[in-house]
Amino acid sequence: MAQEEEKDAGISKYISTTDEIIIGCKCWVEKDGEQRLAEILSINNRRQPPKFYVHYEDFNKRLDEWILASRINIEREVTFPKPRDPDEKKKKKQKKSATPQATDGETLESADIMDLENLNVQGLRDEGISRDDEIKKLRTSGSMTQNPHEVSRVRNLSKIIMGKHEIEPWYFSPYPIELTDEDVVYIDDFSLQYFGSKKQYARYRQKCTLRHPPGNEIYRDDYVSFFEIDGRKQRTWCRNLCLLSKLFLDHKTLYYDVDPFLFYCMTQRDELGHHLVGYFSKEKESADGYNVACILTLPQYQRMGYGRLLIEFSYELSKKENKVGSPEKPLSDLGLLSYRAYWSDTLIKLLVENGTEITIDEISSMTSLTTTDILHTAKALNILRYYKGQHILYLNEDVLLRYEKLIAKKRRSIDPEKLIWKPPIFTASQLRFAW
C-alpha cells in the first residue's frame, strides 16, 4: 500500500540545478514572500533565461504564471512525475470496454464547486448532477465547447495593453503563435485587432476610423451605451472579441463559431469614442431558453457595478421578448456570484415593495427570471417554505434588513424607457450556420 502511494505521488529527490526540472515536476516556488508548492506545466527555452509556467497547488488557475529559475527553491526536494507504465494504457482500454456506463464526472474537485443545479430545494427534484457530467450533457458547438488539449492549461500571453490599460491575462486564448513570444501584445480599443509591436499598433491606429462596436446602438444613458452586433455580419470583430474574452474566461467560448450569436456590448463614451467595458452573447435561437451564452466584464472595469448592469440588461431584453430566461450553465465562479447577488436583490425588492400576495409564476412574469432560479434563490435566502403541497415565501428580519441596505446603496440601473429595440426575427435560411 505504501509503495502504491509513493508511486502515485511521484518520486521525490534533491536536484543540483533547475536544468533537471521537467514538465510535471512539483517544486517549491517563492510567491509573495512565501514558499508555495507548484506544478511545472510548461518550460520555455526559446529565449534566455528559460522560464517555467507554474500552477500553485490549492490556488485558482488564474494565478498561474511564468517565472524565472531564480524563484524555484532547489534546496528542498522536487517531486518528479511517476514513470509511465507501458501496460497502463492497455489496462485502461480494457477497463473502459468492460464498463461502458462508468463515468469519471463525480470527482472530489467537482464536489467542491458551487453549482446552481446541485442546490436542493424541498419539493423540487434534485438531480445531483456534477459539474463535469453537466458539461458532457451540453452541446458541443458555440460557446460551450471545451478545449481538451494540455496546451490550454498554459496561459500564452504575458501582458496586453488595451487603450490606456495594462492587463495581465488569466487563461489561455488561441491567438496566433507568433504573439506568444512577445512581452506585450497591443489590442486596439475599438476594433479589438491585435499586434505584436507598438509600432505596428500605432501605424494601424492612424488608419483605423472605427470608434465604436460595429453594430446598432440600442441603449444610451448618461453613463453607458449598448450596441447589438450580429456575429454573422461582423465575423472578424466578434472573433476578436471572443479571443479577448477567452483570456479571462476559462470554461467556454469557441472563437471562430460566432454566426449563431448576437453580441450585446456595453461601452463608456469619451472624446475618443466608445470604449468596450463588457459584453454578453446570446444565441439567436436557444432551444434551452438561455438568455445569455457568455458574459464578461473586462478586468479593468470589474468591481464597479458594470457586471450587474450587463445582467440587468439581459433581463430587460427578455422582458421585451415576453420570455423568461436564464444564463447558460455552467457559470464561472465570478459569474455565479454576480447572478446570485442579482437574483437575490431582485427578489427581495419585488417582495418587499409589492406588499400583496403574489405567486411565483407572477414573479417570473414580472422579472423574466425562471421559476427554478426564483425557487433556488428563495431557498438560499432562507425564505422558502413547503406548506400543504406548495411553496410559499415569507419575509424575515434578515431580508428586510438587506432591503434597507439595498435601497441605501442607490446603485445605477438600466432605464427601460431608453431601450430602443425590437426582438430580431430570423428566417430559417438566416439560422443556417454552415460556412
UniProtKB/Swiss-Prot annotation:
Residues annotated to bind acetyl-CoA: A293, C294, I295, L296, T297, Q302, R303, M304, G305, Y306, G307, R308, S332
The UniProt GO MF terms for this protein read:
chromatin binding; histone acetyltransferase activity; histone crotonyltransferase activity; histone H4 acetyltransferase activity; peptide 2-hydroxyisobutyryltransferase activity; transcription coregulator activity
Q: Does the keyword Lipoprotein apply?
A: no
Q: Which residues form the Tudor-knot domain?
A: 22-73
Q: Where is the MYST-type HAT domain?
A: 152-423
What does the record list as coiled-coil region(s)? none
Q: Which controlled-vocabulary keywords does the entry list?
A: Acetylation, Activator, Chromatin regulator, Chromosome, DNA damage, DNA repair, Nucleus, Transcription, Transcription regulation, Transferase
Zn fingers (C2HC MYST-type): where? 185-210
Q: Which residues are catalytic?
A: E328 (proton donor/acceptor)
The biological process GO terms on file are: DNA repair; DNA-templated transcription elongation; positive regulation of macroautophagy; positive regulation of transcription elongation by RNA polymerase II; positive regulation of triglyceride biosynthetic process; rDNA heterochromatin formation; regulation of cell cycle; regulation of transcription by RNA polymerase II
Q: What does this protein do?
A: Catalytic component of the NuA4 histone acetyltransferase (HAT) complex which is involved in epigenetic transcriptional activation of selected genes principally by acetylation of nucleosomal histones H4, H3, H2B, H2A and H2A variant H2A.Z. Acetylates histone H4 to form H4K5ac, H4K8ac, H4K12ac and H4K16ac, histone H3 to form H3K14ac, and histone H2A to form H2AK4ac and H2AK7ac. The NuA4 complex is involved in the DNA damage response and is required for chromosome segregation. The NuA4 complex plays a direct role in repair of DNA double-strand breaks (DSBs) through homologous recombination.
The domain section of the record reads: The ESA1-RPD3 motif is common to ESA1 and RPD3 and is required for ESA1 histone acetyl-transferase (HAT) activity and RPD3 histone deacetylase (HDAC) activity.
Q: Report what the protein is called.
A: Histone acetyltransferase ESA1
What organism does this protein naturally occur in?
Answer: Eremothecium gossypii (strain ATCC 10895 / CBS 109.51 / FGSC 9923 / NRRL Y-1056)
Query: Gene name, please?
Result: ESA1
